[in-house]
UniProtKB/Swiss-Prot annotation:
Record's protein name: Nuclease SbcCD subunit D
Primary gene name: sbcD
Family: Belongs to the SbcD family.
Entry GO MF terms: 3'-5' exonuclease activity; DNA binding; DNA exonuclease activity; endonuclease activity
Keywords, alphabetical: Coiled coil, DNA recombination, Exonuclease, Hydrolase, Nuclease
Role summary: SbcCD cleaves DNA hairpin structures. These structures can inhibit DNA replication and are intermediates in certain DNA recombination reactions. The complex acts as a 3'->5' double strand exonuclease that can open hairpins. It also has a 5' single-strand endonuclease activity.
Signal peptide limits: none
Superkingdom to which the source organism belongs: Bacteria
Any one Gene Ontology BP term: DNA repair
Description of how the protein assembles with itself and partners: Heterodimer of SbcC and SbcD.
């Protein structure tokens, strides 16, 4: 059986007010081409179909039209679970209609697996589909303590038990996979993922992923990656488009899994080419360098984060001229020469870890200042790492 694993479509998401819907339509068309060319038997979409709990109508229309096409009008089974960005009630509202066409929309976490006949493979697919499992969606208070470590431990145990319960009910003659929208400890994050829980309370250990599944399809992290410490093959497929400039330069892909009942699964990554790339320009030589790049036709079909070294503040006229020359400029961020000289004078070893974090945060966010609570949380985490290293 060939299974395509995708996640984190974030339909309706914008980039600083710019619509990405046409790019999202293009990448879903590309997925449809892939499932045909690769003879995919079933699809698992591991959460965050939408970017908000109240997505625009055009995003919902694109979602249902794409599912219809990807399912080949009901011939190819699809399982979609809700992520932390999705409204679980809204996502599953159409289930009575979609279920008849082999499309399973799962809004809330459940401990019962689903078994699906896959006609093209002539095999049975068992899916332990655990939609985003927050306390609210589990309808359960996991702990009455405010101790972060205890909360994390209780949550980890709850997720491990949910997986174990589901996988224990898998039929032995089925291809067995699990799917969830969670943060697994050690995964590489980007700026475009909304934190599942401040402080990391909703973190799952890699070892808590189910060993009895041939494959675990994960959603939430936007960078494709394999979970190394898991007891079975487990991957984040990543998002099909880059949604923040922290993802600039990273390839986007989907994962194809080949599995048979009772055997280990294998996988391959299929790169995606749709959508505009997100790129960073650093113009150390000022406006003249930027216009030189524009004359060369550099990154014509891209969204651009521009950092430009200048002696004085850019005028509104200069900013307008740049945006007219290339409509893809998202950020135009001046860096003043005096600031650069000051930076060169400061040696990192003389800067406190708090100030280094603040400077890093400002750089990553384009000038935003972290609030007191975030700085406090970072210092607590950093202190914990130092204590562990000292042991």
């Amino acid at each position: 059986m060939r299974i395509l694993h995708t996640a984190d479509w974030h339909l309706g998401k914008t980039l600083e007010g710019r619509s990405r819907l046409s790019e999202q339509a293009d990448v879903l068309d590309e997925l449809n081409t892939i499932v045909k060319d690769e003879q995919i038997d079933a699809i698992v979409m591991a959460g965050d179909a939408f970017d908000t709990v109240n997505p625009p109508a055009l995003a919902e229309q694109l979602f249902y039209e794409s599912l219809s096409a990807l399912s080949d009008r009901g011939k190819r089974p699809i399982v979609v679970i809700a992520g932390n960005h999705d409204n679980p009630d809204r996502l599953s509202a159409a289930s009575p209609l979609t279920h008849e066409n082999g499309i399973h929309l799962i809004g809330y976490p459940t401990t019962e697996p689903i078994h699906i006949e896959v006609p093209s493979a002539g095999e049975l697919l068992a899916v332990g589909a655990l939609a985003y499992p927050s306390e609210a969606r589990l309808n359960e208070v996991l702990s009455d303590t405010f101790d972060e470590k205890l909360l994390r431990d209780h949550y980890d145990v709850k997720i491990r038990q949910a997986f174990e319960h589901m996988t224990s009910r898998f039929r032995t003659d089925a291809v067995k996979i699990a799917a969830s929208h969670i943060y697994v400890a050690g995964g590489n994050q980007t700026d475009s993922e909304r934190p599942i829980e401040v402080g990391g309370a909703y973190t799952v250990a890699a070892e808590s992923l189910p060993a009895d599944a041939a494959y675990v399809a994960l959603g939430h992290l936007h960078r494709p990656q394999t979970i190394k410490r898991a007891r079975t093959l487990a991957r984040y497929s990543g998002s099909p488009l880059a949604y923040s400039f922290s993802e600039a330069g990273y390839a986007k892909s989907v994962t194809i899994v080949d599995a048979k009942p009772g055997e280990e699964a294998t996988w391959q990554e299929v790169l995606l080419s749709s959508g505009k790339p997100l790129v960073k320009w650093k113009a150390a030589n000022g406006l003249s360098e930027v216009y030189s790049w524009l004359d060369e036709g550099r990154d014509q079909n891209a969204w651009i984060d521009l950092e430009i070294r200048v002696a004085d503040q850019l005028s509104l006229e200069e900013i307008h001229r740049l945006r007219k020359a290339h409509p893809g400029f998202i950020h135009i961020r001046p860096v003043f020469e005096e600031q650069n000289k000051d930076r060169e004078r400061i040696e990192v070893k003389h800067v406190s870890i708090e100030d280094r974090f603040k400077k890093f945060y400002e750089k990553q966010t384009g000038g935003a200042v972290p609030d007191e609570e975030m700085v406090k949380l970072f210092l607590e985490l950093a202190s914990g790492v130092e204590e562990e290293d000292a042991k």
